[in-house]
């Protein structure tokens, strides 16, 4: 399941989300607020107001997956909401940072270089 993440895009729904919503409510939020296709291979990540709970919604073949994480101590390093846009595309590495309790604004390792010719 997590191995398939490498093929998918990851979007954060900025601002707090009422996590009492389940699959139907979150997929409606994806289509109407985020203006995205909930049936795509993308992963949609939602966080509550206190930033201690998180849900990830994604479609796989014949049905939805809904992952839920609750922190017993601490908060997720969720970015601040702004007027526009309603979502933020992040990298797979940044999602792992969030799940590990780190903020997205981490100092990055050396950027990968893509050369065509050596010499």
Task: Describe every region a protein language model picked out.
Residues 1-119:
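Polybasic/polar functional segments that serve as interface/processing modules
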């Amino acid at each position: 399941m997590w191995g398939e993440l490498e093929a998918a895009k990851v979007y954060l729904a900025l601002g707090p989300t009422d996590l009492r919503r389940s699959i139907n409510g979150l997929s409606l939020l994806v289509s109407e607020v985020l203006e995205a296709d909930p049936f795509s291979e993308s992963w949609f990540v939602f966080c509550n107001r206190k930033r201690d709970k998180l849900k990830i919604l994604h479609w796989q073949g014949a049905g939805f997956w809904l992952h839920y994480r609750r922190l017993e101590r601490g908060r997720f390093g969720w970015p601040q909401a702004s007027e526009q846009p309603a979502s933020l595309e992040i990298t797979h590495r940044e999602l792992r940072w969030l799940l590990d309790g780190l903020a997205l604004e981490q100092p990055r390792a050396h950027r990968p270089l893509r050369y065509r010719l050596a010499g």
